[in-house]
Amino acid sequence: MPNLKAIRDRIKTIKDTRKITEAMRLVAAAKVRRAQEQVMASRPFADRLAQVLYGLQTRLRFEDANLPLLAKRPVKTVALLVVTGDRGLCGGYNTNVIRRAKERTEELEAEGIKYTLVIVGRKAAQYFQRRDYPIDAVYSGLEQIPSASEAGQIANELLSLFLSETVDRVELIYTKFVSLISSKPVVQTLLPLDPQGLEAADDEIFRLTTRASHLEVNREKVTSNLPALPPDMIFEQDPVQILDALLPLYLSNQLLRALQEAAASELAARMTAMNNASDNAQTLIGTLTLSYNKARQAAITQEILEVVAGAEALR
């Protein structure tokens, strides 16, 4: 016969665990909203910066401008910026990014191209350091919602590698925020910058909304109308110098948005994982409660039978 106290203790333990997973789910949901608000808050600056860069690039289209960040050269070495989280309990979020990064290193090796890793997040650092991958820098302990200063610090490291010609291309591997139950690791080229990319093609903004007591994500396509600068605009400095100064800022801004989206993906994955854990705990509590009631009923029945048997024996 099952031990009633053991079942009762197990039910209590699972209920306590469910309280923790439910609290973590609610915290993750609140932080996803904060990540969304950060993206929305930086949107006007990003749009204006893209407008100025596009206008300058259009103005200089027929000039022989020397812009190192736009210069393409034969690729011998690639820097891979791999973005994961510092913590677990987020489903397959970290594993999927690490797997995609490993696949990319194998693709580069097959092409005879060297690579080095710049890692954001403790999980990826632990994985690749343990396996002796070439690592240039590791950034961990970042704020859960990345800040502009953190993105700028990472961007400066990437700029240093690219401008010193230590690497010929910089690629970003991060998780694109698709929905609360879906995320997709993607590979994106950061350097050299593509002038055509200044038109914000395929750009999207995500919004976390509530419908019928459930959280869902709406994605909104961004269509940027980037007019050319007025032809009679007079620059106090050389337009080439202005563009050369703004391109690092544009890179930092693009990196910040990618880090924010990766953070939102991690939080959404954690929210989903904790929601599943809470549901599983509730199911297990129901099963154990049923087992407890059956065992208790069997114990009561057994006691009644023993009392009846004892009474019969005394006759």
Curated annotation (Swiss-Prot):
Superkingdom of the organism of origin: Bacteria
Compartments where located: Cellular thylakoid membrane
* Disulphide-bonded residues: none
Q: How does it sit in the membrane?
A: Peripheral membrane protein
The record ties this protein, via Pfam families, to: ATP-synt
Q: What is its main location?
A: membrane
Q: Which InterPro entries match?
A: ATP_synth_F1_ATPase_gsu, ATP_synth_F1_gsu, ATP_synth_F1_gsu_CS
Role noted for this protein: Produces ATP from ADP in the presence of a proton gradient across the membrane. The gamma chain is believed to be important in regulating ATPase activity and the flow of protons through the CF(0) complex.
Q: What is this protein called?
A: ATP synthase gamma chain
What lineage is on file?
Answer: Bacteria, Bacillati, Cyanobacteriota, Cyanophyceae, Synechococcales
